[in-house]
Amino acid sequence: MTHPIVKSFYDTATGSWQYVFHDPETREGAIVDPVLDYDPNAGATATRRADEILAYVAGEGLTIKWILDTHPHADHFSAGPYLKEQLGAPTAIGEKVVEVQKLWKGIYNLDDGFRIDGGQWGRLFADGETFMIGGIEVAVLFTPGHTLASIAYVAGDAAFVHDTLMMPDSGTSRADFPGGDAAILHASIERILALPDDTRVFVGHDYAPDGREPLCESTVRQQRESNIHIRDGFARSDYVALRDARDATLPLPDLMLAALQINIRGGRLPEPEANGQRYLKIPLNQFEGDFSE
């Protein structure tokens, strides 16, 4: 088996990990969960993080075959369309994204011009589908629970699991977003932990607890033995109770209401209005606020 070379890129503003993996023999590669910079105070976007990826791709002489999303993110904007424009590679996500689009179309009260067929991406992957990056087979695993549409990409010995597992000292991702479900997330995590012990696990977020450096990589064995939420022997009912209690204490992500209306469009910004300006739309009082001191 050819093992992919994996390069990680950390976005400090959102605690998000982005990845480029490639076949060292053919130099073909893919990008996973790229971030578009966004300053909420100024309402401004930038491509600094994506440009770092482009510089790496050019420096390594890679041919990017796919720009991959694991799900529509609630904490950052996707840079997929920008990278597609620069590289010519198609974008892809899991086929259940249509369920997320239907859900959030109602929350944002979007008009019928908003497509809910996933057509904003070049490809919608089904569970169990495979594709090739050079000589490396990439398998798609449906891993819902954090969202309705979450998938993981298993490329050789590397699994890109995004918002399911976190680093072992941080546990697992939340399951309280619209369409989330802790019991379903637990089942998805079990599916990931059924991969071979030495499978490299690359997470989507790390918030550097206790002041350590941000980390992105562990193994299935390490997750099974030491993850604080799901180590061996932790029953699903116990996990659901723990996850639900933990989620009840968490504020919504700072960028959720801004990011999701971009990301259900495949990362495309809203169309300009008559004055040539683009606008975000925020539903007031749709969610419970945090007014604690």
Segments and roles (model prediction):
Residues L36-I136, S226:
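Active-site HxH/HxHxD metal-binding segment of metal-dependent hydrolases
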Residues T2-P4, A187-R200, G204-E293:
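Accessory terminal helices/loops
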Residues V6-F9, V20, D127-A155:
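Core dinuclear metal-dependent hydrolase active-site scaffold
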Residues V32, T63-P72, A92-E95, T143-G145, ...:
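Active-site neighborhood of phospho(di)ester-bond hydrolases with catalytic His/Asp-centered motifs
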Residues F21, D33, H71, L83, ...:
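Divalent metal-coordination and catalytic microenvironments
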Residues T172-L195:
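Active-site-adjacent loop/tail segments of enzyme domains
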